[in-house]
Amino acid sequence: MTGRVTSVRGPVLDIRVEGPLPAIGDVVEVGSLPVVAEIQAHLGAADVRAIALHSTQGIARGETVRTTGGPLRVPTGPAVLGRLLDVAGRPADLGPPIPAEAPRAPILHPAPPLAAQDARFQVFSTGIKVLDLLAPLAQGGKTAMFGGAGVGKTVLVMELIRAMVSGYDGISVFAGVGERSREGHEMLGEMKASGVLDRTVLVYGQMNEPPGARWRVPLTALTIAEGFRDGEGRNVLLLIDNVFRFVQAGAEVSGLLGRMPSRVGYQPTLETEVAALQERIASVGRASVTAIEAVYVPADDFTDPAVTAISAHVDSTVVLSRQLAAEGIYPAIDPLATTSVLLDPAVVGEEHARVAGRLKEAIEHYHELRDVIALLGIEELGREEQLMVGRARKLQRFLTQPFFVAAAYTGMEGRSVPVAETVQGCAAILAGECDDWDEGSLYMIGTLAEARAREEARRRKGAA
């Protein structure tokens, strides 16, 4: 079937179709490039409205339109490994075209039925101390990292990609949604340099692209991840940076289509769109898709409707703190606001859950006393409270860690720490084994043994 463009208003195309109308969600190809557009509304017996997924520059009234007979289909499987793709699955890395025989799958389809999903919890170990201790990640689950601008979300996502590729026989799929072109270029270069690109797929819909591309690129990446899970039986780590930009693009599309906005200007279908993405992320059979999602928090407002809609779907919530980042605590993860459904004795073990609970209590008690310390000085506290404050500060510093992906900027080699070492180190600090240590000995190290060696070296230097 063919048709003609009757109106062009930015990324919104009105089309007159010859023959039966294409279904809502089907894509059409416009012009000779071609520009891909998704049908969003039926305006009459022969007229439809579509949102372009590529730039409409050069498209004019009267342009030929070809229907495809279904939703957007993107390539999946081994042929896309090591490639940078756009929202339509086209190569964007100047490499060869994707082979025609590569399997393709539609980006719009329902979530797996509940009966097919594996609801058992398995912990995905990252080697990042504060995450493994306080917010264990669920394999086949969803983790959201909430934070404002400049607190370290993207660096944390990149470190998790490295952890997946180096520690697991799995595939990573990265969706760059509405982020800067510079960041995408840097990530591609760093992955090539570190040798992890051959087990990674990058799918970009960046901030200079039309809202339709930014709106659909997470579904393109998820479809590719599902292809590896269902077709290859591989475990997949899906990283989305940034889910807030997906919601933002949906609001732009909603406004372009003339829908009445809801709270704070968001689209009336906010909850539906977020659920359509999140509910497809699941374990099926023996393979899983594990999602790590960076979520920008506008103006650090955690009551924003987009933030609350996303947080309702995740198993682990990681909150990045601007105050901790200002204090030089990296990763700047707030131990009190960070939670996980896996932090349960039945899943992580009695000792792990006990140490995590005691650590949170110590840091919370320290926060309660900070105003008193600022006004009167720590000397005004009792002996026991001084010890607790010292231990809380040491725990904060012990949970800092140099990242492999940031080594070029920090000059410090990255560290990956087993969960057992993290639990053991925190238990020792809580028990008072490090009460007479300098806080600096625990800053930006891996295990407690490394901190002990640094403390002994400091003392030898002081004695000399």
UniProtKB/Swiss-Prot annotation:
It is a peripheral membrane protein. It comes from the Bacteria. GO terms for molecular function: ATP binding; ATP hydrolysis activity; proton-transporting ATP synthase activity, rotational mechanism. InterPro entries: AAA+_ATPase (IPR003593), ATP-synt_VA_C (IPR055190), ATP_synth_F1_bsu (IPR005722), ATPase_alpha/beta_chains (IPR050053), ATPase_F1/V1/A1_a/bsu_N (IPR004100), ATPase_F1/V1/A1_a/bsu_N_sf (IPR036121), ATPase_F1/V1/A1_a/bsu_nucl-bd (IPR000194), ATPase_F1/V1_b/a_C (IPR024034). Its EC number is 7.1.2.2. ATP binds at G147, G148, A149, G150, V151, G152, K153, T154. It is found in: Cell inner membrane. It catalyses: ATP + H2O + 4 H(+)(in) = ADP + phosphate + 5 H(+)(out). SUPFAM superfamilies: C-terminal domain of alpha and beta subunits of F1 ATP synthase (SSF47917), N-terminal domain of alpha and beta subunits of F1 ATP synthase (SSF50615), P-loop containing nucleoside triphosphate hydrolases (SSF52540). Its main location: membrane. Pfam families: ATP-synt_ab (PF00006), ATP-synt_ab_N (PF02874), ATP-synt_VA_C (PF22919). Keywords: ATP synthesis, ATP-binding, Cell inner membrane, Cell membrane, CF(1), Hydrogen ion transport, Ion transport, Membrane, Nucleotide-binding, Plasmid, Translocase, Transport. One of its GO terms (cellular component) is plasma membrane. Transmembrane segments: none annotated. Belongs to the ATPase alpha/beta chains family. Produces ATP from ADP in the presence of a proton gradient across the membrane. The catalytic sites are hosted primarily by the beta subunits. F-type ATPases have 2 components, CF(1) - the catalytic core - and CF(0) - the membrane proton channel. CF(1) has five subunits: alpha(3), beta(3), gamma(1), delta(1), epsilon(1). CF(0) has four main subunits: a(1), b(1), b'(1) and c(9-12). This is ATP synthase subunit beta 2. It comes from Cereibacter sphaeroides (strain ATCC 17029 / ATH 2.4.9) (Rhodobacter sphaeroides).
